[in-house]
Amino acid sequence: MGRLLPRPALALAGALLALAALPAGAGMHPTRLLAERLLAEVDDTTWFAEGTGRKVLYVVIDPNCPYCHKLWERLRGPVERGELQVRWIIVGYLTSTSLGKAAAILQAEDPVAALRVNEEDFGFRDEDPGGGIEPLPEEAIRDETRLALAANLALMQNNNLFGVPLAFFRAADGRGFMFEGAPPPDVLKELLSLIDEEPAAPGGDPGAAPRAGSGG
């Protein structure tokens, strides 16, 4: 059905960065048009936020995806320094336990903490390689959780995107931008530097609970 993106070196990284340098008068590249669609449709998803930075990055991940795990690790610094807010959009389709793990994260009282458990214990479940969180059994997955996960997956499927991780954001030039895979740290730093800053918001815990998307 789907796949993960094995692009640790991201051969397309240079081309992606070149897209950002196109002058405003140039026709919008198809990749950036696709990013615009993702931003327009993100309100139909359920995400939870980690971090308090004014730069907002949406990331679609599967709990059992090793490249999603790499990207999670590489985003620790910007998130923990308060430079970045990541809005995690969870899907569950890669393996037989992905749905149960995705549901366990979404139904947790603190989804950010649940995702951290999944990532910090990644690869340590001998009987179930992948994310470290215990998957929920079928009967424990609430109907609203199934609907939320289906809507999250539909964001990808409706745009003919079938690999994770998938990241997208509003760039400083006002247009959408996206990338796939887990870029090397130096490339990731350049990509994150392109993100526009949102206006300062009232205080509060941005990662307390899942919510319907409200970004773009």
Predicted regions and their residues:
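Positively charged n-region of N-terminal signal peptides that target proteins for export
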Residues: 1-7
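Extracytoplasmic thiol/disulfide redox context detector
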Residues: 4, 12-98, 140-163, 181-216
